């Protein structure tokens, strides 16, 4: 099972007055829930995106016309919704039939670092392939390129905002 036997991860070093330094350790538990798909934007997905994209990153506008046509995925840890993303057929690349866009991947801060984003991305890729899709594309900020590259995505030459944003693609077949 994912995460079984995962070593503890150091999360901080604290200097205690009059005492030796002590390491604080925590084990990052794997997600213990499920991923569900919706044909509309659920309120819990909206709330996660508001927190991650609007409050933390100040993206505006966050919600757009693609929310109405996308498949929305929610990841649950137990009964709590902790992550979301959406995907839809890419209408802007008719030269690449079977290309889908995976977008708005967001994991709540207290659930990050547990592989939930990776699981959600893999689930979206499986669903796209099952629907006949052959290419997954993500539009990302450059500080997240490595996340996608570690999962098989390649940066394209479609860069924006002086390279701060770009498209990454992955063949699904």
Label every model-predicted segment.
Residues 23-80:
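Short amphipathic alpha-helix that is part of the acyltransferase structural core
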Residues 74, 80-90, 99-106:
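Conserved beta-strand in the GNAT
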Residues 90-102, 112, 162-165:
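A conserved beta-turn-beta hairpin within the catalytic core of GNAT-like acetyltransferases
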Residues 113-126:
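Conserved acetyl-CoA-binding loop-helix of GNAT-fold acetyltransferases
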Residues 128-141:
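Conserved GNAT acetyl-CoA-binding A-motif
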Residues 141-142, 161-173:
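C-terminal "cap" of GNAT-fold acetyltransferases
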Residues 149-159:
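Conserved acetyl-CoA-binding loop of GNAT-fold acetyltransferases
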